[in-house]
């Protein structure tokens, strides 16, 4: 089967993977998009394992407040360049919003929860996917959730940049 640019573009939009990685996956699967997605997912897991030994000391703190609940989360990356990246920021925002609806008592329980935006994945699976797309080691370092009948508000100094 001939792999067209449109097929590569569609797979790239679905996965966020690079052009050549998408093309290779489509060639390997003879144009089967679902099989190509699975190959890219497995490749992303391998990439995440390789990157997991690298230090992720940069990152951001993000808060979410809704219906008497507030969550704060710290997500780390290797560089401040990635910490400022729109995809990274969106991921961190989604993590904070998921924490609002989570009953997880600790990080292990949270990482095992279904990802709210795609329940076929866990939070850990989505983190691995983001590592593959962004290309740096990342980790959800810590989070805290509070509930109150009073007023909850949020303020993050310095745009959420980590300062030690």
What are the roles of these predicted feature ranges?
Residues 2-164:
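N-terminal assembly/interaction segments in proteins that build large macromolecular machines
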């Amino acid at each position: 089967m001939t792999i067209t640019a449109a097929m590569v573009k569609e797979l790239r939009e679905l996965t966020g993977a690079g052009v050549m990685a998408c093309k290779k996956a489509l060639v390997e699967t003879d144009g089967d998009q679902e099989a190509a997605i699975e190959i890219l997912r497995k490749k992303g897991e391998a990439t995440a394992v390789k990157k997991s030994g690298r230090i992720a000391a940069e990152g951001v703190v993000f808060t979410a407040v809704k219906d008497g609940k507030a969550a704060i989360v710290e997500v780390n990356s290797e560089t401040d360049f990635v910490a400022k990246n729109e995809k990274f920021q969106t991921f961190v925002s989604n993590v904070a919003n998921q924490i609002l609806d989570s009953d997880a008592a600790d990080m292990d329980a949270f990482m095992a929860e279904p990802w709210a935006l795609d329940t076929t994945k866990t939070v850990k699976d989505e983190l691995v996917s983001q590592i593959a797309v962004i290309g740096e080691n990342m980790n959800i370092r810590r989070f805290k959730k509070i509930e109150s009948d009073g007023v909850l508000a949020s303020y993050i100094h310095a745009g959420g940049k980590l300062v030690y």
